[in-house]
From Swiss-Prot:
GO terms for molecular function: alpha-glucuronidase activity. It is found in: Secreted. It catalyses: an alpha-D-glucuronoside + H2O = D-glucuronate + an alcohol. Alpha-glucuronidase involved in the hydrolysis of xylan, a major structural heterogeneous polysaccharide found in plant biomass representing the second most abundant polysaccharide in the biosphere, after cellulose. Releases 4-O-methylglucuronic acid from xylan. Keywords: Carbohydrate metabolism, Glycoprotein, Glycosidase, Hydrolase, Polysaccharide degradation, Secreted, Signal, Xylan degradation. Glycans are attached at residues 222, 310, 465, 527, 576, 682, 732. It holds the Pfam family Glyco_hydro_67C. It comes from the Eukaryota. Coiled coil: none annotated. Its main location: secreted. This is Probable alpha-glucuronidase A. It comes from Aspergillus clavatus (strain ATCC 1007 / CBS 513.65 / DSM 816 / NCTC 3887 / NRRL 1 / QM 1276 / 107). GO terms for biological process: xylan catabolic process.
Length: 840
């Protein structure tokens, strides 16, 4: 028998590379087999045309030199001039190439930041429209080599949109809002520290996926970033990013003229305010001449903004746009503006209406260097939402889409969720503006409405963890974001497989296994967290992590489900509801207005229906809930065995790191499944046709065991404990024992123990069979996993440990001893004994 929950013993395997910690991401440049003619085809010289010190051209040459050395043990010299293509790779801008190589092959037409890569006829030519484009081409060439692709190619590629940014929600104290990969790499104790050593590697990763801008601080901004010493620090950050073609920008606090500048107003039309922002902007550009611009969150979730002074959001955005215009900077102005104190008692209130209500009347009133940054859905990064109708309502305004790489509502990197298939439901959706093809991707590029600016922003939130995001597999989402921002019609699985080959090597089983797991992960998470468009049924008032469907309703945040004993869902129709459907162009509105034509996966987003409403699948809503939550959790169980099939094919450190998370996810998916099903079973009173919900024949409730030093505890929310109760030690210094005589047939079982591991202590548990040790463990999720922790017994802290292949004899006595620590009273929920092949 063996325990599966926290870090397991690392076993060295013959032939494996030295253990890796994830710091290199996909830029590992791991050894690639290349012999004979292949080896001879590799360049021995690298010609960098007209490089300046620390320019993207110089970086491109260094990257290729390093890549060739690490992948093929080949030392290539770097030379600053020359046009000979024999055994050489030539890197440069189009202008430099035409000047230095007048008789060379003509280069096809390139758009801004585009590049031409040619490896035919024994040549390697990487020519960019700009220095940044040439660097992108160098990374493209290295990507091919690292995947074992030596086929001759010749093609040009250019970006889908000019803005391809990432946002970091880093705070000045070094913490991070909704970051699950450690502390900030930019800030500490209110300042920008001297040690910025991780920033260069982040710049490399971003450049390799063609990201050209970064906002380094939280949208809930602290005005102290604008102090002179911190502006100096921003200059140091920008100096690190600049050679990689990534421009630095910052988030602003709208009230800074008052909170930092000492003015008695922050009215955007006040001359003193205008002058103050002009001076601050000038000071920033003195230090960072190529600063990207500003990101602004205003009049949302308590943040200050122009409406305080009865000014419009456009007047607020234009304040910054005019200060930036002489310097060439842009304003990304977030459309995430809504009232979080609206009353659910009013049937017609709807947070989803807010963006169009606020911004549509302002179309055409923004300066040309303003870009309205719009979240992909009308609410907030949910597991499934319809596309935001605001994209279809701004004809005369630049727009960008806002995605989330950090998994705020989607498992917080403790659950595997590959996000591009979700994003593609938004990017490819045809909004049919004026009855014409209008996919979202063509609106944000500026193509559909002939706008000069537009593009992409993603909240990433890398941190000091060596995996960057808290999980090795989560990095696939950052990689894919960059690839899609360049070309949004790429296939999500193709992108994923490029990332797998660069990250984990070329073994076919590794490729197929991680592909299968990843492509199944978003549908599985949707199934066990919230489906039919009901949103992610997480605790929206606390951690945004574990299940708590009741938290959606009864408050002013507007993420309502309107679930009661008879019906569920938001009526957003024109006929009877909030009229949200009317914000879409007519062809789309007509689809969503009618239950019969609304897709099942968005039914509860647009309609309030009885639990017995039949779906297009033929199932009732409530039975679909039950079935989907079981199906999703069942899929999550398979991730463990799939990953275990790769033992010996992946270096031990990364293998064990991922395995720990997948084992945890398998257990937590059951917590999700049971919590949601029990909640709606209790609310609706409708039984599961398959008699699974509320029936757990393999479980023994902890409160039904013989207790010594333990006492029963009513868990809140009730559905996050099996049978609503758990047990805790009588005091925080009392060791507790729970024991029971087993009435199961003799045989081998997997012994699962569900417990609660919350912040504020590291309890210890030991399990015995007839006084024979089965296993022991510690409540140390805070040291092992990435998600936001709870200080309660709830769906966030609920965890399962499993001991496999335990030999049980009927009549054996199972005993669990819990030793509390700190605030944590060694809580237990239940034990389960599962015959092999049975999922609880």
């Amino acid at each position: 028998m063996r325990s599966v929950i926290t870090t397991l013993t690392l076993v060295a395997s013959v032939g494996l590379a030295v253990a890796e910690n994830g710091f290199d991401g996909w830029l590992r440049y791991a050894p690639v087999s290349c012999h004979g003619a292949c080896q001879k085809s590799l360049p021995s010289h690298i010609v960098t045309l007209d490089p300046t010190e620390s320019s993207p051209i110089s970086v491109a040459g260094q990257e290729i030199q390093d890549g060739l050395q690490r992948m093929f043990k080949m030392h290539a010299t770097v030379e600053p001039k020359g046009c000979s293509t024999r055994s050489s790779v030539i890197i440069g801008t189009l202008d430099a190439y035409n000047h230095a190589c007048k008789d060379a092959d003509p280069v096809p037409e390139l758009e801004e930041d585009g590049f031409w890569l040619n490896t035919k006829d024994g040549k390697v030519q990487i020519i960019g429209q700009s220095e940044r484009g040439a660097l992108y081409g160098a990374y493209e060439y290295l990507s091919m080599l690292s995947q074992g692709n030596f086929a001759p190619v010749s093609y040009t590629t250019s970006p889908h949109a000019p803005i391809r940014w990432v946002n970091q929600w880093d705070n000045m104290d070094g913490s991070m809002e909704h970051g699950y990969g450690g502390l900030s790499i930019f800030f500490k104790d209110g300042v920008i520290p001297q040690d910025l050593s991780r920033v260069k590697q982040y710049a490399r990763l971003l450049a390799s996926i063609r990201i050209n801008g970064i906002i380094v601080n939280n949208v809930n901004a602290n005005a102290s970033l604008l102090k002179p010493e911190n502006m100096d620090g921003l200059a140091r950050i920008a100096d690190i990013f600049r050679p990689y073609g990534v421009k630095v920008g910052i988030s602003l606090n709208f009230a800074s003229p008052s909170t930092l500048g000492g003015l008695n107003t922050y009215d955007p039309l006040d001359e003193s305010v205008i002058s103050w922002w002009g001076g601050i902007t000038d000071e920033l550009y003195k230090r960072v001449p190529d600063m990207a611009g500003y990101l602004v969150k205003a009049n949302s979730e308590g943040q200050p903004g122009p409406t305080t002074y009865n000014r419009t959001l456009a007047e607020g955005a234009n304040l910054f746009a005019r200060a930036l215009k002489p310097h060439g900077g842009i304003v990304m102005f977030r459309a995430f503006v809504y009232d979080h104190h609206i009353s659910e008692e009013n049937w017609y209130n709807d947070r989803a209406n807010a963006a169009v209500d606020f911004f549509k009347p302002l179309d055409g009133k923004f300066e040309e260097n303003v870009v309205v940054q719009i979240k992909y859905g009308p609410i907030d990064f949910q597991v499934r939402e319809p596309v935001s109708p605001l994209f279809a309502n701004l004809y005369k305004t630049n727009t960008a889409i806002e995605l989330q790489v950090t998994q705020e509502y989607l498992g917080q990197q403790s659950h595997l969720v590959y996000l591009p298939p979700l994003w593609q439901t938004i990017l490819g959706f045809d909004l049919r503006v004026d009855g014409k093809p209008s996919p979202t991707r063509d609106i944000i590029s500026g193509q559909r409405f002939n706008r000069p600016l537009g593009g992409w922003a993603a909240v990433v939130n890398v941190g000091t963890n060596t995996t960057w995001l808290g999980s090795h597999l989560a990095l696939s989402n950052l990689y894919a974001y960059g690839r899609l921002a360049w070309e949004p019609t790429l296939d999500s699985q193709d992108i994923l497989q490029d990332w797998i080959r660069m990250t984990f090597g070329l073994d076919r089983r590794v490729l197929d296994t991680i592909t299968k797991m990843s492509m199944e992960s978003w549908p599985a998470y949707e199934n066990y967290s919230g489906n039919l468009g009901i949103q992610t049924l997480t605790d929206i008032l606390y951690t945004h992590y574990g299940p708590n469907p009741a938290s959606q309703d009864g408050n002013g945040w507007g993420q309502w489900t309107r679930a009661d004993h008879e019906a569920i869902g938001m009526d957003r129709t024109i006929k009877n509801g909030t009229k949200f459907t009317g914000q879409y162009p007519a062809e789309v509105a007509q689809v969503y207005e009618n239950i019969e034509t609304t897709p099942d996966d968005l039914l509860l987003w647009f309609h309030h229906v009885p639990y017995t409403q039949r779906l297009q699948s033929g199932k009732t809503v409530i039975q679909h809930f039950y079935d989907a939550h079981y199906a999703g959790a069942d899929t999550a169980q398979t991730f463990v065995s799939q990953w275990e099939s790769l033992r010996g094919k992946i270096d031990p450190e990364r293998y064990e790191h991922v395995l720990t998370r997948l084992i945890y996810q398998a257990g937590h998916s059951i917590v999700w499944r049971d919590a949601i099903n029990e909640f709606y079973h209790n609310l609706s009173g409708i039984a599961d046709e398959k008699q699974r919900v509320g029936h757990h024949p393999w479980r023994i409730e902890a409160e039904d065991m013989k207790l010594d030093g333990y006492v029963p505890y009513d868990v809140n929310p009730f559905e996050t404990a099996s049978n609503t109760k758990a047990i805790v030690t009588a005091t925080n210094s009392t060791t507790g024992t729970a024991s029971t005589q087993l009435d199961f047939k003799t045989g081998k079982y997997d012994l699962g123990i569900n417990y609660y591991d919350f912040y504020g202590g590291k309890s210890q548990w030991t399990a015995y069979l007839n006084d024979r040790l089965v296993g022991q463990w510690q409540g140390n999720n805070e040291d092992v996993l990435s998600h936001e922790l709870s200080v309660y017994l709830d769906g966030h802290s609920a965890t399962r440990i499993t001991f496999r292949d335990v030999k049980i004899h009927k009549g054996d006595r199972l005993k669990i001893v819990g030793k509390p620590d700190g605030m944590e009273p060694a809580p237990l929920d239940y034990v389960v004994l599962l015959p092999q092949g049975i999922v609880d």
